[in-house]
Amino acid sequence: MVNVVLGSQWGDEGKGKLVDLLVGEYDIVARSAGGNNAGHTIVVNGVKYDFHMLPSGLVNPNCQNLIGNGVVIHVPSFFEELKSLEAKGLKNAKGRLFISSRAHLVFDFHQRTDKLRELELSGASKDGKNIGTTGKGIGPTYSTKASRSGLRVHHLVNDDPQAWEVFETRYRRLVETRQQRYGSFDYDPEEELQRYKSYREQLKPFVVDSVNFMHDAIKKNKKILVEGANALMLDIDFGTYPYVTSSNTGIGGVITGLGIPPRTIKEVFGVVKAYTTRVGEGPFPTEQLNEDGEKLQNIGAEFGVTTGRKRRCGWLDLVVLKYSNLINGYTSLNITKLDVLDTFKEIKVGVSYSVDGKKLESFPEDLLTLAKVEVEYVTLPGWEEDISKITNYEDLPENAQKYLKFIEDFVEVPIQWVGTGPARDAMVHKEI
């Protein structure tokens, strides 16, 4: 049985907290897309664990963890993150953590060219804005993957006597191509080659054929939780292109990023922040560049775990959520950070878009259209009381329940969990 946790907006919805809540019930936690370009924090017994690339199922000592073929891996960061987690007391990680042999490798030159490409794109764009990359080399790695010139984990750990020679040749070809494209840049390819050579033996114990790994687990009726990265509105196909990440962050990426058939997926949990945030550039129809936006930012402590960048803030956009549900097919929702709205007298919710007075029937794919949309809001009464100590759904203020019911009715998906505060256990469960 496979269940999936996916972000429904532009990321930073609080997926990690739900995974943290659920992980004790699962035998395996898997990641299917992205790299170390996203992050979340999990608190266990007062200890904070920061996750970027590694599956957060590592906090459960009885859980196996898989980094799937759809993930791109910067090997130095992999070991640094593992070392950091172990230094905080995480035990037996090495026997419970596995990497797909088909996952592509991120190199330092990918990270250098990521930043150069960002400058190039911002200089060529009409408004001078950039995509807002994290600079982790994710996009350039997926680019080499798509062009069939990338290097995968199995290329690095292959025991064939000629394997390292082939690896070196392909690696140097990749570097030369980028030097031809961008000229000379601060980078020592020979040093990185030797570093990766030293990683070969260290990495081998982690590497598995992930297709066999997953299908063997499914055959044995193991409970598997897939931990989504980023969110649907950052999906390379369905997000606000080009202000997106470079992988499929929706349900399709789970299937291709782990090599599992759709019929194995039972539940899809959509994680929804009670308002909306976005990091970096790109369309954001319900953004509030005013006192309300600042209030959401300050109360919600909206800063990125990976980049530290301030998040843009606005009201909940149900047009986005409904569109997200069309693609991902959520079986239930987790509304997070509802407590951030505790002090608002009135709360607005975006329910439709129009351009030049004409209502749009669906979420627009074109940024020129999206830039012109006028958002129609419904104003709901706030509850103006602290909900952080509430443990039962029925004890939530009446207006808080009405707010949640409005979301359920609009999207036509039941809400199963509600985040009521920053504490690990500040989550109300609702029977569905």
Curated annotation (Swiss-Prot):
* Record keywords: Cytoplasm, GTP-binding, Ligase, Magnesium, Metal-binding, Nucleotide-binding, Purine biosynthesis
Q: Where does Mg(2+) bind?
A: D12, G39
Residues recorded as binding GTP, renumbered to this chain, are 11-17, 39-41, 311, 337-339, 419-421
- Superkingdom as given in the UniProt entry: Eukaryota
Q: Which residues bind substrate?
A: V305, T306, T307, G308, R309, K310, R311
InterPro entries associated with the record = Adenylosuccin_syn_GTP-bd (IPR018220), Adenylosuccin_syn_Lys_AS (IPR033128), Adenylosuccinate_synth_dom1 (IPR042109), Adenylosuccinate_synth_dom2 (IPR042110), Adenylosuccinate_synth_dom3 (IPR042111), Adenylosuccinate_synthetase (IPR001114), P-loop_NTPase (IPR027417)
> Which residues does UniProt call coiled coil?
none
Cross-referenced CDD domains: AdSS
GO CC, sorted alphabetically, is: cytoplasm
Enzyme class, spelled out = ligase
Question: What biological-process GO terms show up in the record?
Answer: 'de novo' AMP biosynthetic process; IMP metabolic process
Cofactors per UniProt?
Mg(2+)
Task: Give the UniProt subcellular location, in the record's own words.
Answer: Cytoplasm
Q: Which Pfam families match?
A: Adenylsucc_synt
GO molecular function, a single term: GTP binding
Assigned protein family: Belongs to the adenylosuccinate synthetase family.
Q: What is this protein called?
A: Adenylosuccinate synthetase
